[in-house]
Amino acid sequence: MGEGTRKIGSMHLHYSSMERPPLEPERLRASLVAPVGPLARLDVIAETGSTNTDLAEFARLVPSEYPDMSVLTAELQTAGRGRLGRSWQAPERSSLFVSVLLRPVNPAGRPLPTQSYGWLSLLAALSLTKSVAARTGVAPRLKWPNDVLVDGRKLAGVLAQLVPDSSGNPPAVVVGAGLNVSLTDEDQPVPTATSLLMEYASTTDRNVLLQDFLLQLNLDYRAFCAVDGDATAPWSGDGSLRDNIAERMVTLGQTVRAHLPGGGEVVGRALELASDGGLVVIDSDAGIRQTITAADVIHLRPSEA
């Protein structure tokens, strides 16, 4: 079982996995699952390799049992995947590992255009920043494409994957989020990570944090579906989805190095978000605007640019 020590002033806080409070499935279902809440189903399991992989497989094999807003969460995830397929693992009960199945349709029941799907991971990251800030007093920011940061340190990551439909219907999407909740200095997978505990959050109750996130995600997702997945349309009474994300994104305006999946890199200034959620960068060498849809992005200091 994972253990860690958190130093606060002259005190050390010691944690073992079993001392961290567990998720409470019945409490969560009572407040979140229909007809009371917005979820179709909520499954809480002790351990898995990856909630994203599991939920995508369930949705592919028995789609009728996994409608829109089906949720899978785990106390321990042993083979989670991040950007560019990187793996990471945290001690049991120290984080939120949650995946949500989305089958996006507009209010008339028409599927959203698949080109809008690129926004869903950004939307989920936005929902997470909003729910965490409202509950804990910690003010996270977004880093393109899928990181949630506090003062440059990674608090959470979001990853989306398509689930093909064998009957010819549009694919579903599984959006997964991993939020570092009570990780200590000793638990951190990398030195550039952080957790709500380390940021002195007003609460580290994962039941409350999970409920807040899923309720906020549902609100934002429904607003996105109501405008047919148009991220530039007036959205939720407060600008567009793109505007809301841009306001919280620290990448914009930065000089960045983007390592592309197929090799090669682009160095330039991050200008804006494209209509599909990609990152528009002005190449430093050629002065050409390029839209990057997938990359490992590093924010450069002036001396590195």
Feature roles, as predicted:
Residues 6-134, 302-305:
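N-terminal lobe of the biotin/lipoate ligase/transferase fold
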Residues 7-21, 105-140, 150-305:
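Long, positively charged amphipathic alpha-helical accessory segments at protein N-termini or as interdomain linkers
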Residues 80, 147, 178:
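Active-site glycine-centered loops adjacent to acidic/histidine catalytic or metal-binding residues
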Residues 142-146:
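Alpha/beta catalytic cores of group-transfer enzymes, especially the acyltransferase/condensing modules
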